């Protein structure tokens, strides 16, 4: 089952897959303030109903683990570092965990990292424009996730260090009054 807490900010390139739990939990109300939605979904019917309700027309399945990269540790590490780089998307990011575990980190209004530890049956919806990052857990080193999309699947990350603000980012910042 999901855990939400403030990140301890003690991560490095060598240990970012560890849990980094500060001991300060985060409530669902705190997540709602930044537009993050969490659901616990145990059946395909529930997932399909959510997709219909939120007008998600497309989906795919992604598997992240070393075998998915033909056991090429360099390619695997490069992808994990890419996902862990702080970024946002112009569309909602919807992930349903089917297998394994992963961490999604999102920024709160004070620019602190909130960490979500996701396991099977956890679904997370991140609003367009929110800064976030992802990594596998050190324990599992594997995740199989269903990605849901309103339109055709696209995945363009806009890294924070570029300083680029699109309409999606500006709208998100206004929505949460940052």
Curated annotation (Swiss-Prot):
The protein's required cofactors: Fe(2+); Ni(2+)
InterPro entries: ARD, ARD_euk, RmlC-like_jellyroll, RmlC_Cupin_sf
Residues that, per the record, bind Fe(2+): 87, 89, 93, 132
GO cellular component, one term: nucleus
Keyword Iron: yes
Name recorded for this polypeptide: Acireductone dioxygenase
Gene: ADI1
Gene Ontology MF annotations: acireductone dioxygenase (Ni2+-requiring) activity; acireductone dioxygenase [iron(II)-requiring] activity; iron ion binding; nickel cation binding
Residues annotated as binding Ni(2+): 87, 89, 93, 132
UniProt entry keywords in alphabetical sequence: Amino-acid biosynthesis, Cytoplasm, Dioxygenase, Iron, Metal-binding, Methionine biosynthesis, Nickel, Nucleus, Oxidoreductase
Primary site of residence: cytoplasm
Lineage of source species: Eukaryota, Fungi, Dikarya, Ascomycota, Saccharomycotina
Catalytic reactions on record: 1,2-dihydroxy-5-(methylsulfanyl)pent-1-en-3-one + O2 = 4-methylsulfanyl-2-oxobutanoate + formate + 2 H(+); 1,2-dihydroxy-5-(methylsulfanyl)pent-1-en-3-one + O2 = 3-(methylsulfanyl)propanoate + CO + formate + 2 H(+)
Protein species of origin: Candida albicans (strain SC5314 / ATCC MYA-2876)
UniProt keyword Chaperone, yes or no: no
């Amino acid at each position: 089952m999901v855990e939400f807490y403030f990140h301890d900010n003690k991560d490095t390139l060598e240990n970012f897959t560890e849990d980094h739990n500060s001991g300060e939990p985060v409530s669902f109300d705190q997540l709602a303030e930044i537009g993050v939605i969490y659901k616990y979904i145990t059946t395909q019917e529930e997932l399909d109903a959510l997709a219909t309700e939120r007008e998600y027309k497309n989906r795919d399945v992604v598997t992240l683990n070393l075998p998915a990269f033909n056991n090429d540790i360099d390619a695997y590490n490069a992808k994990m570092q890419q996902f862990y780089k702080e970024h946002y998307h112009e569309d909602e990011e919807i992930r349903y965990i089917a297998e394994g575990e992963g961490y999604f980190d999102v920024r709160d209004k004070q620019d602190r990292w909130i960490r979500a530890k996701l396991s099977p049956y956890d679904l997370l919806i991140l609003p367009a424009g929110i800064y976030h990052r992802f990594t596998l857990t050190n324990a599992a080193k594997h995740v199989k996730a269903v990605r849901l999309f309103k339109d055709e699947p696209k995945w363009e990350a806009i890294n924070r260090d570029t300083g680029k603000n699109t309409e999606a980012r500006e709208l998100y910042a206004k929505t949460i009054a940052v």
